[in-house]
């Protein structure tokens, strides 16, 4: 079977939907959107998102104060430890300042920062109805614009001619197109690939066996592997780096989403299964540090940790879906969590003794810290001395992986350092160009939205259409 389109988009998450809506805007071209998932699970990881990090030089509707380019860049530089392409990162940052009017035109609605979502009212615009509403809005718009969508249509391979896209294969169907954009996500739901990437630790464990997949089960990386292995596409990123969060250990194996997060880490202590602390819980604001905790827990014995708080923390963070273990004494809490009670009590006693008096303020980098304790807790260090006590078992939860396709400011896939003339990439498949490590809340949506629009413009240009009117509208918005 054979079919031909002007544009084929592989992957129908947020980035793919942005592409589809952009390329179909004037009705001149045929656009096919291929989604691996069934309709009920469409949207990739985008159905689990809740906000977009965006630059703005002055207050805007749901955003307070200002969040200028340089501050956004410094935040990104800090969380990535410098492992980022500055030119591409700044392109994302600048595009984030103009994308919301475009999103609104396609039915996306915004609301102010949620109560309990600390430190994001200035930096992040929240989606009204969450990621599911975002995805549904994009699909409604795509349908109205005449985009063809095929569900349960994973692309296993593509045909190339000297770096030029020719066709994509879905089963036995060959789909030719003048231009193609890849937006098929990472490989986080490919258990075998994760296992190979992470290998064994010093204890003989296979850490990836204990990972939970916070996002979609359909991002298996088949097409990414095909591009890297069979077509020698230029790669970017480390296969062990990912947006990895410490999530409720009771979460499902796949698709737990945002509701599995445990957001009280900075308000207490975190111990491993040996009942010992292993990292500074108060290093920085939670939106800039929540995504390092999955990796930290992955490096602990058994890939499990325990977030511990007392009654003083209740009401200061977004409560998890399921109640934690509760006890009136630390010893009883340890026993319920399966921890050695004397060791746990000694760990908490040492922490309590090291807490220095200060002015507690969870909205600022306060002066409540420990002294003479390793690892230190540098902010929000209050003694755990007010029952009841609460404990939450956490495991590594992967949202998306950072190994992907190297690209440039045109979003072109590159082969041997040369850009393809008609094959482009967007979303998580290229996020490693901006995120070499670490994460900050909402930046994945910034990357997907920005490069969805960039790839759409480049794909149109590859077919001789410059999208000038649309670009002018976006720039003025």
Regions of interest found by a model, annotated:
Residues 24-46:
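Glycine-rich FAD pyrophosphate-binding loop
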Residues 39-148, 193-196, 270-277, 283, ...:
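Conserved N-terminal/central alpha/beta ligand/cofactor-binding core
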């Amino acid at each position: 079977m054979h079919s031909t389109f002007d544009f084929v988009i592989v992957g129908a998450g947020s980035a793919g939907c942005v592409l589809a809506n952009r390329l179909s805007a004037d009705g001149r071209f045929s656009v096919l959107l291929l989604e691996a998932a069934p309709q009920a699970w469409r949207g990739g990881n985008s159905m689990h998102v809740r906000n977009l990090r965006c630059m703005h030089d002055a207050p805007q509707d749901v955003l307070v104060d200002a969040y200028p380019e340089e501050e956004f860049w410094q935040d990104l530089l800090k969380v990535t430890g410098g492992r980022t392409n500055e030119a591409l990162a700044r392109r994302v940052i600048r595009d984030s300042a103009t994308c919301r009017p475009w999103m609104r035109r396609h039915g996306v609605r915004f609301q102010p920062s949620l109560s309990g979502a600390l430190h994001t009212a200035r930096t992040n615009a929240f989606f009204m109805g969450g990621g599911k509403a975002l995805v549904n809005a994009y699909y409604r718009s795509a349908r109205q614009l005449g985009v063809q969508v095929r569900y349960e249509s994973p692309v296993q391979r593509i045909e190339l001619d000297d770096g030029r896209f020719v066709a994509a294969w879905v089963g036995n169907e060959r789909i030719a197109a003048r231009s193609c954009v890849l937006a098929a996500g990472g490989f986080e739901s490919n258990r075998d690939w994760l296992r190979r990437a992470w290998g064994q630790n010093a204890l003989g464990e296979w850490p990836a066996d204990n990972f939970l997949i916070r996002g979609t089960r359909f991002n298996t990386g088949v097409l990414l592997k095909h591009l890297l292995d069979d077509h020698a596409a230029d790669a970017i990123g480390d296969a062990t780096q990912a947006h990895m969060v410490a999530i409720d250990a009771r979460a499902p194996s796949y698709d737990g989403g945002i509701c599995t997060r445990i957001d009280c880490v900075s308000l207490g202590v975190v111990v491993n299964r040996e009942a010992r602390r292993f990292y500074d819980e108060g290093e920085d604001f939670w939106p800039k540090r929540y995504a390092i905790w999955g990796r930290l827990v992955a490096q602990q014995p058994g890939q499990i940790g325990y977030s511990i708080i007392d009654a003083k923390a209740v009401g200061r963070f977004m409560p998890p879906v399921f109640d934690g273990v509760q006890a009136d004494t630390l010893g009883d809490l340890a026993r319920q969590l399966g921890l050695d009670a004397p060791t746990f009590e000694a760990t908490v006693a040492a922490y309590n003794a090291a807490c220095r008096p200060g002015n507690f303020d969870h909205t600022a980098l306060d002066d409540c810290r420990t002294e003479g304790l390793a690892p230190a807790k540098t902010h929000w260090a209050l003694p755990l001395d007010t029952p009841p006590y609460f404990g939450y078992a956490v495991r590594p939860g992967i949202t998306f992986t950072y190994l992907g396709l190297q690209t440039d400011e045109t979003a072109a896939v590159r082969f041997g350092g040369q850009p393809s003339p008609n094959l482009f990439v967007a979303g998580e498949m290229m996020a490693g160009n901006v995120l070499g490590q670490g994460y900050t809340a909402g930046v994945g949506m910034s990357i997907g939205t920005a490069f969805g629009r960039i790839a759409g413009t480049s794909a149109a240009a590859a077919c001789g259409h410059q999208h000038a009117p649309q670009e002018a509208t976006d720039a003025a918005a």
